[in-house]
Amino acid sequence: KARDAISLKFAGSDTFHISAEFLRVMSPSAEVRGHSPDKAILQTGKRDVVIEDIQKTGNYALRIYFDDGHDSGIYSWDYLHDLVINHAKYWSQYLKELHTRGKSREKEMQVLKMFDA
């Protein structure tokens, strides 16, 4: 069953809910992050992305499968904890970057006009 968020509970903390969109745009994969910070690729149009599957990777991480085909991010427990702790900061930075580049969280629509010949 596809989900639009996951819940995480770390030892001694409350339960945190993280949206699929946030997890997708913050994917730790080289495909998203690049091989250095200046090579990161801004993720756009991910507002409606959902999680199709989650698999444990050993005892240290989760691999999350998204409905847009992205599945190369390995989310370590430390990275997930960082996302929880810094959610507001990272989300604000992401929204600012979208605005700066004139991009959107919405999928880009292709418009096709039909004409009678």
Where on the chain are the PLM-derived regions?
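Motif-centric detector for short Cys/His coordination patterns
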Residues: 1-117
